[in-house]
């Protein structure tokens, strides 16, 4: 019987995990090992993937992968507690990480006073790592409620300690090279060799989190364990005997609440101490030399003797390297540069372990780790009862991820977001701001006339700067409103459910459900959408997602849509806007289907993800994100757009002999843009001024509107140049043509220059063809 056949609400015990490679290792690292109890929680609305409960937390996997996990309804616990084993009781505080207790003054060897103490902040996804980073550094990194918010390393300085540098690394579950985040984190720890590690552990789910802790301890880097969410642990009736756990692990353990700022000072004190005095974790042998783990014990110690010299030359801790070789880690094996005879001996050692354990090598090592964790938790942790948040989340999920209600709920939520943004809240605030901007422009024009300012200077200030920048600023409310709703959806935990719901549908076009998140973020801005693709473990999926993200209309294009909708489709704003968004999605789907069979052949990455509890988005976090987005928009408005506005005003106001022109058709701009304009004649907008606006849009999409405002002066002048069919085609072209220079730069950073150039050309060709077809269809009516 396989896990795929188990009914909802039923529990079984895992007999074996099939498959091979990095995915199988990832399943083992997540706790899907022989003897573990697993419960089916629910199936996605489309029947796939499935949510399971294991080790006290929820995980989603596909039915295809569940079919490779052998189970039995009648189970025998994989680990049996030793007879006569007594809890440690109320042990005295071991004193790790404290001066004069762990070491003697006369034998200490502190680092020089001017040494910069570097720390790596490491932990599982969604365990409060970025919140702790903000507490430690007083910075304002965005905190989400979706696994994998941190997609790049972020550096900061610990408050009041200028000679420190702490790096917030992407969240990982183990030191196995499954995803790009795990590889980035592992390479940082092995190559950059920070002076200390702050390992943040979710106290409410300590068993799963400690799997990573054990591997970090093998790195022999000074380390402090931060037990986060202890406030939630206490509220739900749980507790941790910190002294006993510290003695068990051999590293300082500090209970904290990153969200409330509790225990941060003590954590910093211990971290600084272990780093300054280079107090590495005490050597702890995780596997017993007796009983069923003796084979693993002998295997790891034999490998340690075999590779000791090679590990030292490669700069890899011997115990860590031995554990990884016992798991068949190819990257570590490559770095050690073993001879052929040594490789054969290594294989013989592993085969001997498999024969004695009756399971494969990866399962044996993973089982050893979880057994040690189970022993530690039995003696030190009183598990909390099911939290109110978990109960509430389950009730909400009955609707938002229900079989018959999940997809309608998603459509309704996204429809409500767009309606409120474009027709209610955003539109109302935009009208208010536009009225204010108009009054400022009139007042400024009158003041300049009264002061007798030169006509050229007045034209620059009023027609160039105020008219151009002001036309863009008026759309700030719409952009902020859209980001507000996207932030609410992410912080609440709903984004993870969207990935769960949409996985089966996205798989039909060659993607994983996790790809929906970068694309949804792309509706706000393409740049973070491209960066968010780093959470995808497959290079194929990552490239494909990045290629499709520009089809998701970013918020910077909203001013263009609103401008043309008001001019050519009055009273139909919501219909046109939603239509454009859906058309972009449709083009993305068609492109994905084409790429699936050509450029990106193969299967999408497996869907393995946690579903976090729902929570109320924090006002501070949402406000911080909105401020960052508003500030970014304003900075672009007064830098890139401001500069582009002045340049366009100059090129439009002067001819090649630098004489001011009365007719802009004789200007420098008309001459240059006139060379490009014929390309757009078949699309119904071959005017040189529109070509100019599209070129300026490559710098920043918002500048399209400011450029048109400067060149045409009024909406009436624009409507006299193009008809409804041309306007529809222009909207489609603006929807699909090349992303802005910032987005292209982010694509270049992720995929390289050739891919970035390819995206520019590809998007422009797609945009031209789609606009040509739309223009022809509209002309028929």
PLM regions and their residue ranges:
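Extended, low-charge hydrophobic alpha-helical regions
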Residues: 356, 363-367, 383, 424-465, ...
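Juxtamembrane inter-helical linkers in multi-pass membrane proteins
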Residues: 435, 439-443, 496-524, 601-625, ...
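Transmembrane helix-loop junctions at the membrane interface of multipass transporters and ion channels
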Residues: 551, 555-578, 742-752, 773-781
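Hydrophobic core segments of alpha-helical transmembrane domains in multi-pass membrane transport
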Residues: 409-420, 482-487, 565-567, 580-594, ...
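Canonical P-loop GTPase G-domain recognition
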Residues: 233-286
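Conserved C-terminal guanine-recognition region of P-loop GTPase G domains, centered on the G4
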Residues: 161, 184-253, 560
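Conserved G1/Walker A P-loop phosphate-binding module
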Residues: 92-174
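Extended helical scaffolds that flank P-loop GTPase cores
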Residues: 277, 282-453, 660-669
């Amino acid at each position: 019987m396989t896990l795929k056949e188990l009914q909802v609400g039923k529990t079984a015990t895992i007999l074996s995990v099939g498959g091979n490679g990095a995915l199988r290792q990832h399943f083992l690292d997540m706790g899907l090992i022989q003897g573990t109890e697993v419960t089916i929680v629910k199936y996605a609305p489309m029947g796939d993937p499935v949510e399971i409960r294991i080790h006290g937390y929820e995980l989603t996997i596909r039915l295809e992968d569940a079919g490779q996990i052998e189970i039995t309804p009648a189970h025998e616990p994989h680990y049996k507690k030793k007879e006569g084993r007594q809890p440690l009781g109320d042990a005295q505080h071991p004193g790790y990480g404290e001066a004069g207790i762990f070491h003697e003054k006369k034998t200490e060897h502190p680092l020089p006073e001017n040494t910069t103490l570097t720390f790596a902040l490491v932990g599982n996804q969604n365990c409060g790592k970025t919140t702790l980073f903000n507490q430690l550094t007083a910075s304002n990194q965005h905190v989400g409620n979706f696994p994998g918010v941190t997609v790049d390393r972020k550096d900061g300085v610990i408050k009041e300690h200028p000679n420190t540098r702490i790096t917030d690394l992407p969240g990982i579950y183990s030191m196995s090279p499954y995803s790009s985040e795990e590889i980035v984190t592992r390479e940082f720890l092995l190559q950059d060799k920070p002076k200390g590690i702050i390992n943040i552990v979710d106290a409410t789910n300590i068993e799963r989190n400690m799997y990573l802790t054990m591997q970090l301890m093998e790195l022999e880097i000074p380390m402090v364990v931060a037990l986060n969410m202890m406030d939630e642990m206490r509220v739900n009736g749980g507790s941790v005997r910190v002294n006993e756990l510290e003695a068990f692990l051999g590293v300082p353990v500090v209970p904290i609440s990153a969200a409330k700022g509790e225990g941060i000072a003590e954590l910093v004190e211990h971290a600084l101490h272990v780093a300054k005095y280079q107090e590495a974790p005490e050597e702890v042998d995780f596997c017993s030399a007796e009983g069923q783990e003796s084979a693993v014990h002998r295997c790891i110690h034999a490998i340690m003797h075999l590779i000791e010299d090679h590990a030292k030359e490669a700069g890899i801790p011997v115990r860590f390297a031995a554990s990884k070789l016992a798991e068949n880690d190819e990257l570590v094996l490559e770095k050690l540069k073993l001879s052929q005879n040594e490789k054969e001996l290594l294989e013989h050692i592993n085969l001997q372990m498999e024969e004695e354990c009756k399971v494969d090598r990866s399962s044996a090592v993973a089982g050893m780790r979880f057994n040690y964790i189970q022993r530690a938790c039995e003696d030190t942790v009183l598990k909390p009862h099911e939290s109110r948040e978990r109960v509430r989340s389950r009730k909400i999920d009955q609707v938002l991820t229900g079989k018959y209600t999940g997809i309608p709920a998603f459509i309704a939520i996204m429809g409500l977001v767009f309606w409120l943004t474009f027709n209610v809240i955003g539109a109302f605030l935009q009208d208010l701001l536009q009225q204010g901007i108009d009054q400022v422009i009139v007042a400024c024009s009158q003041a300049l006339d009264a002061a007798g300012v030169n006509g050229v200077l007045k034209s620059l200030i009023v027609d160039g700067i105020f008219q151009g920048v002001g036309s863009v600023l008026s759309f700030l409310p719409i952009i902020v409103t859209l980001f507000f709703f996207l932030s609410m959806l992410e912080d609440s935990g709903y984004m993870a459910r969207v990935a769960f719901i949409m996985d089966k549908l996205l798989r039909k076009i060659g993607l994983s459900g996790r790809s929906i998140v970068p694309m949804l973020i792309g509706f706000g801005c393409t740049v973070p959408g491209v960066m968010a693709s780093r959470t995808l473990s497959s290079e194929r999926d990552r490239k494909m997602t990045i290629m499709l993200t520009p089809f998701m209309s970013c918020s910077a294009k909203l001013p263009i849509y609103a401008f043309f909708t008001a001019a050519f489709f009055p009273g139909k704003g919501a219909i046109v806007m939603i239509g454009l968004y859906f058309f972009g999605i449709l083009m993305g789907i068609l492109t994905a289907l084409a790429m699936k069979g050509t450029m990106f052949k193969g299967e999408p990455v497996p869907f393995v993800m946690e579903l976090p509890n729902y929570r109320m988005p924090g006002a501070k976090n949402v406000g911080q994100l909105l401020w960052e987005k508003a500030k970014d928009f304003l900075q672009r408005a007064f830098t890139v757009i401001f500069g582009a506005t002045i340049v366009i005003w100059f090129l439009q106001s002067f001819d090649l002999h630098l004489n001011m022109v009365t007719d802009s058709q004789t200007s420098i701009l008309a001459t240059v843009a006139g060379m490009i304009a014929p390309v757009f004649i078949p699309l119904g907008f071959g005017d040189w001024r529109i070509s100019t606006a599209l070129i300026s849009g490559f710098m920043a999409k918002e500048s399209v509107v400011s450029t048109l405002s400067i060149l045409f002066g009024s909406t009436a002048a624009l409507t006299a140049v193009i008809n409804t069919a041309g306007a529809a085609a222009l909207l489609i072209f603006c929807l699909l043509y090349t992303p802005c220079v910032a987005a292209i730069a982010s694509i270049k950073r992720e995929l390289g220059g050739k891919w970035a150039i390819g995206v520019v050309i590809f998007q422009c060709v797609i945009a031209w063809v789609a606009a040509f077809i739309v223009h022809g269809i509209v002309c028929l009516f």
